[in-house]
Amino acid sequence: MKEINRGAILPLLKEAAEAYWHQLEEQVTPKLGEREKSLLDWLFVQYQDEDKKRWYDPCHILFSTKFALELVDKENLDPLIVAGIILHDIGYFALKDKSQWSAKESRITHMQEGTPRAAKVLYDNGFTSLEVEKTLGMISVHDNPYIGIPIQGEARLGLRDCDRVWVMHMLSFYKDLVSRPERCKKPREFLHDRMTQFYGWEHPFGAQWKVTLNRVVKNAERIELPRYDVTKEYVTKQFERRIQEMDDGLVLDEDKFRKHLKNQIGIE
């Protein structure tokens, strides 16, 4: 397969993210309670400092907040997952080198630093002691599976689902794909690995995506099945979209990818 032009795709993703951010904001904000709106307002004031965010963070937070609202509605989860997902990544403010955000040490640091920061913001915006306690419980463990520690508790697993579904959104999937040269050379291999991370041994995508023992071993540390039915349905739909895009070769053609990105991003 032809190699992906990383230098062409990444700017398209960043450009699309800017418009998508505001589209998401219009969709999400009216559905929030006053306290949650205050949390989001506080966060976006922080994001005015470019050193405090990665270019995709506004889209990630808004998209995952939208998903949290859906889980609260359809899976009857604790509404505090909304506050939790809004604040879950503020510990990254403490990382000077954002390029190393996915390292295990950074995962640990951002949970440790994010928990006390979130406590102050929650108290400042009218959350009770019990609500703060529950929300901090979610934030303090939300990336535990990436460091080999399982998460327990329905609300905490709900927040984990909200956070993790983002990686199959086209903005996140393709920014991860082009983040490393070796992935650009073998994009289907990257998609196959991610499929294994979400489904383990069994998935619904056909024999061409056969899961081997070697692939399971390779991805063992990242294998984590979604908790809730709403999440499972969304993830399956996103994999179907990413597979079709691979089959169509869209990411190999800058013009085609630009048009597809513009048309698709709003319905992700």
What are these model-predicted stretches?
Residues 30-32:
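Basic/hydrophobic alpha-helical interface regions
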Residues 40-49:
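Short glycine/proline-rich turn/loop motifs
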Residues 43, 138-139, 159:
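A generic structural signal for nonpolar/aromatic side chains embedded in well-ordered alpha-helices
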Residues 78-99, 103, 110, 114, ...:
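His-Asp-centered metal-binding catalytic motifs of divalent-metal-dependent phosphohydrolases/nucleases
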Residues 117-154:
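Hydrophobic, well-structured mid-protein blocks that either form specific transmembrane helices
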